Amino acid sequence: MNCRELPLTLWVLISVSTAESCTSRPHITVVEGEPFYLKHCSCSLAHEIETTTKSWYKSSGSQEHVELNPRSSSRIALHDCVLEFWPVELNDTGSYFFQMKNYTQKWKLNVIRRNKHSCFTERQVTSKIVEVKKFFQITCENSYYQTLVNSTSLYKNCKKLLLENNKNPTIKKNAEFEDQGYYSCVHFLHHNGKLFNITKTFNITIVEDRSNIVPVLLGPKLNHVAVELGKNVRLNCSALLNEEDVIYWMFGEENGSDPNIHEEKEMRIMTPEGKWHASKVLRIENIGESNLNVLYNCTVASTGGTDTKSFILVRKADMADIPGHVFTRGMIIAVLILVAVVCLVTVCVIYRVDLVLFYRHLTRRDETLTDGKTYDAFVSYLKECRPENGEEHTFAVEILPRVLEKHFGYKLCIFERDVVPGGAVVDEIHSLIEKSRRLIIVLSKSYMSNEVRYELESGLHEALVERKIKIILIEFTPVTDFTFLPQSLKLLKSHRVLKWKADKSLSYNSRFWKNLLYLMPAKTVKPGRDEPEVLPVLSES
């Protein structure tokens, strides 16, 4: 009978004890602030001879061995083969050596910081798994410090358990799911008039009875694996099963002696739920035609039955994969289309004015037929015709009408030409602005005079409040300081402004006139036949 089938498997004993007669582990981790000892193992097997020289050494990093003695630190005590710390601190981390005659034993000690917000330190917790309804026992004892221990307390999740025995508290019961948690044994002891404590913590996980698990293979029952001839493939079969269950591979007899098929060693680990996770890999090297379209079956077997999943190797071309040249060609086409779209968008942004004008010309769109207004634009400009303002005045009353009216077929409202003398000028201006689709403002250094102030205020009211008219700003001469303008016009100034450049704006096909037509209402253009294509030269001064 296998030892794991003995009834003793029904008993789970967790003995929280530090009763080892010597310290055999070469690497040790302890928590700061607790008593700790190192003991050489040979001393427990042989009678120590009084005359035998025993020495303890410490080495930290690149430092040489330093011999330890009671004068090294008040926290260190030497008792033949035992080195005691009262208590151990962070700076005690390092390598320790015990030397007796020609024999030397070495330990590597790592002292970690205590968790001040918990009754235990997570890095010093031992995990244990207990099956539900199995016998569960926790006994708190410490044989080395037993004579110094005053009392011992047992905590669950940092809450003290009220037990009868304060010297060696013990729990004995059948495990239930409610028993899961962190159990800490804390020993309180006195040494040289000081109080110390030693803590040992276990993380107890209660799981279902593992003997009742129904084994199951993970993943789909049928798997098609795309492979290339001459390559290698690994078929991984994983299952959740019981400890005594087995997992194995089966495939056709004709491949049974195939030297390119190998079963790797089974790997098993226990999950946090207490179940066994097994994995077994079938490795097929240098895949040939005989390995294709063959069933490779993975089976898990238990006393309650079996479960099987299958793998079939197929050629990659049979899986309708995209050929490499088709994929490359598709990627090139996709990149070219993306570049073309980016270029098209860039061209549209740069030449949007030309495109809009071309669209208007192509569709012969006219926005002025049904809006009930008389003029396409009211021109606001400086009325004082002084020598220094002569060219600005000429631009407003001669150049704009010549181009927009005679060449492009628009109808403008010019103050000097269209306002009837002797009438109520204020009312007349307000009426003309209401009848206009645009308000063209010719800006200059001397623009804000009393004569144009009302035109501006009325036009801004129509544009910003009633939204019945759109404003077009033309900067005839460079203006650096716009503090003379109303705040509302400054807001418009932050948007698009057309700048007149005499040397570059003379041609009707110049950027200035195209931008002005873009801002004007769409209208069927009827250019004059006798009009020259270039304006007379005007300076910018």
Curated annotation (Swiss-Prot):
Record's bilayer topology term: Single-pass type I membrane protein
The reaction(s) this protein catalyses: NAD(+) + H2O = ADP-D-ribose + nicotinamide + H(+)
Reported modifications of this chain: N-glycosylated. N-linked glycosyl chains contribute to ligand recognition and intra-receptor interactions required for formation of an active ternary receptor complex.
Compartments it resides in: Membrane
Triggers of expression: Induced by IL12/interleukin-12 in T-cells. Proposed to be a phenotypic marker for T-helper 1 (Th1) cells.
GO cellular component, one term: interleukin-18 receptor complex
Enzyme class: hydrolase
Residues in compartment: Extracellular: 22-329
GO BP term, pick one: immune response
Ig-like C2-type domain sequence ranges: 33-121, 133-212, 220-312
Record field: transmembrane: 330-350
Active site location: E455
Glycosylation sites: N91, N102, N150, N197, N203, N236, N255, N297
GO molecular function: interleukin-1 receptor activity; interleukin-18 binding; interleukin-18 receptor activity; NAD+ nucleosidase activity, cyclic ADP-ribose generating; signaling receptor activity
Main subcellular localisation: membrane
PANTHER family: INTERLEUKIN-1 RECEPTOR FAMILY MEMBER (PTHR11890), INTERLEUKIN-18 RECEPTOR 1 (PTHR11890:SF6)
Comment, domains: The TIR domain mediates NAD(+) hydrolase (NADase) activity. Self-association of TIR domains is required for NADase activity.
Quaternary structure and interacting proteins, as annotated: Forms a ternary complex with IL18 and IL18RAP. Within this complex, IL18R1 is involved in ligand-binding and IL18RAP in signaling leading to NF-kappa-B and JNK activation. Interacts with SLC12A3 in peritoneal macrophages; this interaction is increased by IL18 treatment.
Protein name: Interleukin-18 receptor 1
Lineage of the organism: Eukaryota, Metazoa, Chordata, Craniata, Vertebrata
